From Swiss-Prot:
<dbReference type="Pfam" id="PF00238">
    <property type="entry name" value="Ribosomal_L14"/>
</dbReference>
<dbReference type="InterPro" id="IPR005745">
    <property type="entry name" value="Ribosomal_uL14_bac-type"/>
</dbReference>
<comment type="subunit">
    <text>Part of the 50S ribosomal subunit. Forms a cluster with proteins L3 and L19. In the 70S ribosome, L14 and L19 interact and together make contacts with the 16S rRNA in bridges B5 and B8.</text>
</comment>
<dbReference type="GO" id="GO:0070180">
    <property type="term" value="F:large ribosomal subunit rRNA binding"/>
</dbReference>
<dbReference type="InterPro" id="IPR036853">
    <property type="entry name" value="Ribosomal_uL14_sf"/>
</dbReference>
<dbReference type="GO" id="GO:0003735">
    <property type="term" value="F:structural constituent of ribosome"/>
</dbReference>
<keyword id="KW-0699">rRNA-binding</keyword>
<comment type="similarity">
    <text>Belongs to the universal ribosomal protein uL14 family.</text>
</comment>
<comment type="function">
    <text>Binds to 23S rRNA. Forms part of two intersubunit bridges in the 70S ribosome.</text>
</comment>
<keyword id="KW-0687">Ribonucleoprotein</keyword>
<dbReference type="GO" id="GO:0022625">
    <property type="term" value="C:cytosolic large ribosomal subunit"/>
</dbReference>
<dbReference type="InterPro" id="IPR000218">
    <property type="entry name" value="Ribosomal_uL14"/>
</dbReference>
<keyword id="KW-0689">Ribosomal protein</keyword>
<dbReference type="GO" id="GO:0006412">
    <property type="term" value="P:translation"/>
</dbReference>
<protein>
    <recommendedName>
        <fullName>Large ribosomal subunit protein uL14</fullName>
    </recommendedName>
</protein>
<keyword id="KW-0694">RNA-binding</keyword>
<dbReference type="InterPro" id="IPR019972">
    <property type="entry name" value="Ribosomal_uL14_CS"/>
</dbReference>
Amino acid sequence: MIQSFTRLAVADNSGAKELMCIKVLGGSKRRYATVGDVIVASVKKALPNGKVKKGQVVKAVIVRTKKEIHRDNGSLIRFDENAAVILDNKREPIGTRIFGPVGREVRYGGFMKIVSLAPEVL
C-alpha cells in the first residue's frame, strides 16, 4: 500500500535510486496504490549521469510492495521492499533493464514491456 510521501526504491536503470510518491492516479479520492498502479513521484536520490535528475517529477508504476497482495486463487505474496519503475509519457519504461522480481499484477495493467524485461514475474 503506497500513499503520499511513501519512499520507494527504483527497480530500473534510469539513473534514479529513490522516489517519493506525490499522488496516486486513478480517481479524485484514491488514497492507496498497490502493484500495477501508476503514481506521480519525485526523484529524491539519483546518479549524476542518469536519464532522470534529482527533483524531477515523474510517473512510475509500482512493481513490488511490502504489503501482501491477495490473489484470486487464495494465495498471497509480499516483497522485501517497495519498488517502482519510472515511465515516460507513453507509459513505457525509461530504463532498459529491470532489477528484481515484479508482481504478476503489472501484466494486467498493460505494462508488457516491463514484464518482458523483468528477470522474474511472481
